Amino acid sequence: MKRHKEKKYNYTYVITNLVNNKIYYGTHSTDDLNDGYMGSGTLLAQAKKKYGKKNFNLSILGFYKDFKSARDAERELVTIDVVNDPMTYNLKIGGEGGRRIGYRVSSETKEKISKAQKGKPKHLGFSDVCRKAQLGKKQSEETKAKRKEALLNNPYGYNRNKPSHKRDPIMWDNIEKIKEIWENSGKSGAIKLKKLAIEAGFPNKSYARMLEVFRGTRTLL
């Protein structure tokens, strides 16, 4: 098995389609935070082609000491419930390096996979060709400014995934109310919790980090 070469930064992220609010969770390892990375999922790539890259926003959820730790965090984020949710672009559970072994997908996920395969080139090496085509491309000042702003506004910053109530008081000052919603829903996953929270009048944002606080895998600053 090929050993992963460690990079300076390892993080989990969520990409949001600003047109239809669909999301995609993932991990990235890089030596340059301004490398222009915007996810690599099959459905996500198709959506970016359809709606335009400018209509997608990437938010960093948390930084980790190494790639394995980031993968472990991704496993917590991308559960089978997330994969089966029609409002996500994720086709595989997280933390497994792309393997689909050992879990059963819903009819919704099968449909997502089917759509992802339509029109897909059959020859091997296509993804490598696409990646190489991006090498050497310079990022515009506007793109760099947007990524810098995203990092500065990241509520988790470089504090190793410890959420802070200071950045979004509407969410974090009401954490007990949202926890009650979570418990009453049978301790649902991040996607369902988000839907329930929005229905209760809370912000349309990711509740993945808050969910980890509820489960005891993350601490609140």
Swiss-Prot record:
Coiled coil residues, start to end: none
Top-level class of the enzyme under EC nomenclature: hydrolase
Organism: Enterobacteria phage T4
EC number(s) from the headed UniProt entry: 3.1.-.-
Official protein name in the record: Endonuclease segA
Pfam families in the cross-refs: GIY-YIG (PF01541), NUMOD3 (PF07460)
Disulfide pattern: none
Biased composition (Basic and acidic residues): 138-150
Primary gene name: segA
PROSITE patterns for this protein: GIY_YIG
